[in-house]
A protein has these predicted regions:
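Alpha-helical transmembrane segments and immediately membrane-proximal extracytoplasmic
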Residues: 1-246
Length: 246
């Protein structure tokens, strides 16, 4: 392999630093807050078993992302039958509104809602959280399929964090901090090629220590590898498997 010139790293890094700084300045100027320590997750003593747990959580996160992609493709297929864009948007917006009324935790990007889920997880029924999880993915799919504009990353962080709470409630032996922080970023990490950046998001937003960050990084890697493996397998047997974009 030809050696990579050191100048290329600088050429690639500087625009990213400038873009990230500008984005932070705009976000902080508008929102007046950051994601630092946004989610009050209790700290727990690190165990070597947490590393293996990270693998399992990563695989579970991959399954959630695959289910989301299937929901999106199904909704897009149905929405595509409506030729009039105005009617399609009207129906899509109405359905998103119905979901929001039935499941208020699905409203918005998900930052404040995830904080509420984490803070009240001891009193929220696990099946209600499952309904919220499915409702959020369905609302996102409807938005994407019917012409609404918005990003996927923050809503998928909500999906991941909520899934982590569900995992802990179903399997209490999995530490709360590990389940929430790992699933928080492993779900979007299934398709986003930024494992280090996603791990930092979990560390900074949850306030993890360096040891707890290890299973998070493993979960992100396991999620991405699992998803890539499934996609490669399907493409080997079916030529029409779509690309996954975020």
């Amino acid at each position: 392999l030809a050696p990579i010139r050191r100048e290329r790293y600088v050429e690639g890094l500087l625009p990213q630093l400038i873009a990230a700084t500008a984005a932070f300045a705009v976000f902080f100027g508008v929102a007046g807050s950051t994601l630092l320590n946004s989610f009050a997750v209790p700290t727990e003593e690190f165990s070597a078993w947490d590393l293996l747990t990270g693998v399992g959580l990563g695989i579970a996160a991959s399954v959630i992302m695959i289910v989301f992609v299937l929901i999106v493709k199904l909704v897009q297929a149905v929405a595509g039958k409506v030729s009039n864009g105005l009617v399609r948007g009207l129906v899509g917006g109405g359905l998103v509104g119905v979901i929001a009324v039935a499941l208020p935790l699905t409203v918005g990007a998900g930052n404040d809602q995830l904080s509420a889920v984490i803070d009240e997880s001891a009193t929220i029924n696990v099946w209600l959280l499952v309904a919220v999880l499915i409702g959020k993915m369905l609302a996102m799919a409807l938005s994407l399929a019917t012409g609404f504009i918005g990003g996927n990353v923050l809503p998928m962080l909500f999906v991941g964090g909520t899934a982590g709470v569900i995992v802990h409630l179903i399997i209490p032996d999995i530490p709360y901090a590990v389940a929430v922080s790992a699933m928080l970023v492993a779900v979007p990490g299934a398709v986003i090629k930024a494992p280090i950046g996603l791990t930092f998001i979990a560390v900074l937003s949850v306030g993890l220590g360096p040891l707890t960050a290890a299973p998070v990084a493993i979960a992100v890697a396991a999620s991405h590898i699992t998803t890539a493996g499934v996609v490669a397998f399907l493409r080997a047997h079916r030529a029409d498997v779509p690309e996954v974009h975020t």
